[in-house]
């Protein structure tokens, strides 16, 4: 599944499902990757994303938690567009270890989903 995590006007992070096509995900010529990170362990506690990025779960499972009490389970192949730069942020808890993800930073002005 594909998700977008973003900061709302209420100061909370929210999640919505994205319906990306293969061409949306793998072909975005206006987007220039800025950094590529492989992460084994999540950041502790409440945190914001450090930059606009795709997070793709490679193995294991992690659960994102939000200020309203909602959660979202991420498993292998799940893609999240992380855009919650401000506010309370979200939590990330490993449910099935090892949780390995790849983080692909994307320029702020890059169009990465269909308009």
Language-model segment annotations:
Residues 9, 58, 67:
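Short, ordered coil/turn segments that flank beta-strands lining enzyme active or ligand-binding pockets
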Residues 81-82, 96-111:
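A short hydrophobic beta-strand segment most commonly corresponding to one strand
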Residues 26, 72, 88-94:
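Short, Lys/Arg- and Gly-enriched loop/turn segments at beta-strand edges
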Residues 43-44, 61-65, 79, 109-110:
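Short beta-strand segments in beta-sandwich/barrel cores
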Residues 39, 48-64, 104-106:
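Short, conserved beta-strand element in jelly-roll/cupin
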């Amino acid at each position: 599944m594909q998700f977008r995590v973003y900061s709302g006007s209420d100061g909370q992070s929210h999640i919505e499902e994205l319906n990306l096509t293969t061409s949306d995900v793998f072909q975005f010529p206006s987007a220039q990757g800025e950094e590529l990170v492989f992460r084994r362990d999540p950041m502790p506690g409440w945190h914001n994303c450090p930059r606009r990025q795709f997070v793709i779960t490679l193995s294991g499972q992690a659960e994102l938690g939000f200020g309203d009490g909602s959660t979202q389970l991420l498993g292998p192949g799940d893609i999240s567009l992380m855009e919650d730069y401000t506010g309370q942020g979200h939590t990330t808890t490993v449910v099935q270890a090892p949780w390995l993800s790849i983080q692909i930073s994307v320029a702020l002005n890059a169009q990465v989903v269909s308009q």
